[in-house]
Amino acid sequence: MIKRKIWCNLCIDLVAFTSEIFKGAVFQSLDGIVVSANCKLRKIFTLKSKPQDTADKDAVYGVPFSTDEPTDIIPRSCQLMTDVPHVTQLLNMTKLRQTEIKFGGHPLRSAESDQFINRGTSITRNSKNQDVCHIAFGSKVLGPPPLSGRRNNMKISSETVRSVGSKNNRSCQPSTVEKCVNGTEMSALLIPESEEQGNKENIHQIKQTVPIHAANLHIMHPHPPQEPSADKNNNRRRLRLKSTSRERTETPSGSSSGNNRIEDKASTILTTVSQQGAELLNSGTLGPQSPDQSDEWIFPENADHISYLASSRQSLLLGDDSCNPSHLWLEASKESEHDQQAEESQSVPKDIFTFSSRPRSAPHGKTQTMSPEELSFILDLKEDNSVTSRDTQSEDDFYGGDSSEEGNHSIQGSRGPTTGPSELTQLTLESLLGKAAKRTSKEYLRSAYTEAGATESQDSSMEQIDRNNFEMSLLPTTCLSPTGRRCGSCQKTPEPVIKAKDLSAQQVPASLNKTSLKEISGERLSSIPEASEYDWRNYQPSQMSESELQMLASLRWQQNEELEDAGTSHGLSASQVDNCNVSISTSSDDTTTWNSCLPPPVNQGRHYQKEMNPPSPSNPRDWLNMLSPPIVPPSQQPAEQRPDSCESLSVQGEEDLSVEEDEEVLTLLYDPCLNCYFDPQTGKYYELV
């Protein structure tokens, strides 16, 4: 009835619907609008009067449009462009009744509908509570409220079978078949496919008379599931609407996202005229019902066919631990073959849409307990031979995105040729490895994940190499002396604060006066015994996880900050650090000089923001605020050092600022192995006087 595949200005007469649905009520205001159509929505606006209907009124409704009533013009801001094909369609009770007459049924008068509504409730009424009303779903209903919400004992006449669409999905018990007026006819309510979503909101209901032999009629009403789910608000049924040209996925109104549990019982949308395992009525003839038929609802749009519901056996549940993957695979293949044969054997008319409920994946929270073989079935559980892979949408994709038909395609929703369990397992493992690699460091774990099929020895060697590279990236580049000699005093001096592996992080150039230094003779250097070069890799644990490496890195940062807070600052501001042209390199042949004779800037307060930033390992200039030689407590100093050497180190930065220009200043590098200073320009060694 609603125009499809074209932009439509759908105008709904709220005044007419209000007065028809709620007797004696007058429309005043609109509280909210719920749109559940599978279409593109552009704008929602209100008009005081109805606009001119430009749809095919003579062909569709049979009665020409009356022009004596006042009309309104759609505002310019809400009008569509002139080059866009569109129609304006008015929807009121008059149009609905004309549509019922056109499709073979007589319109139901308001008096008859009141009689049918009140007949079921008048049985339970007596003289005491004759005028008692209660509120049901926001509307006032005559009669006392039901005894309990789970069992609603409303007796409904067989002449009018009403389907109640509500958020609770409550259903009525089976009503007994009474004798009709003429004995061979009953009035069944059919909801046509309307407004692109099958009219899930039940805005209007079309009543239609269908001739049926009453003797062969078995009426079954839908029941709620026997086992209530954990969360009532999380029930969601997925309905797939199949036609001859395309497929679209729909969800009933009132259901919220979440629980994807498969319910084998029928929902409360349609009147059913079949009995489970008994008889199936179609156009007055009975046919055998297949026990393996999968949840299919056929909605006819003409009076020649009667809607039926074939309730099937319980569908596949992936969350069931008792299911064997091989059995699941066999059952899925059998069901796909059976569905293909059933679709070929059924002669479905052109205007009939079939709703089928496919097997769905388990809830997201339960997939941790599955094996990889069971996880593989989430990717592609069942092949759908009736539609192309382009029109298929997965369930998760439908929940997460919008409900348009064009766009949303994911890996799970794409249907292809049937693959074996081994190939699916391989795909699942690759996807799991890909997800895990994204969570961790890409450079650190890339080789370990690409070599997943190699032996354990190869894996262990790869991980060890990666850990070494990872730890090397945490440390700044160092500058050592050309010789790897170690003096005896360095080995004897206990330094509990600074560890050996942290000394490389402390090596920065320092500017010292030549008068405060004493050159070390070559004989003393030659007398120092040769020591093997220190390799920090030999002293690392063999097996360390990524979290432990990160913990060690954070400990190094914390230790460096503690050293900086302990008084080892060189006394330079951030502006003076920026003015120096010193670069730290791994070679000791660097010829850069330290220009520390610059006067202090006038305004040093504006650089406090730079001083607050922590040093980054990528920028060597950030490491210049840490002084090279470690401060040793006086109780732990060697005997040859004077007690005031610690004080000379602490005030060294202030002395550098007051150095006169005629004094010679040397740029030296501190060597922790030799416990002395090295001049890269002259190649000489110095120690403090």
Curated annotation (Swiss-Prot):
Q: Where is the composition biased (Acidic residues)?
A: 394-405
Q: Where is the composition biased (Polar residues)?
A: 251-260, 343-359, 409-421
Transmembrane stretches, start-end: none
Pfam families, A to Z: CFA20_dom (PF05018)
Alphabetical list of InterPro entries matching this protein: CFA20/CFAP20DC (IPR040441), CFA20_dom (IPR007714)
Q: Where is the composition biased (Low complexity)?
A: 584-593
UniProt region (Disordered), positions on chain: 241-263, 333-423, 584-659
Name of the protein: Protein CFAP20DC
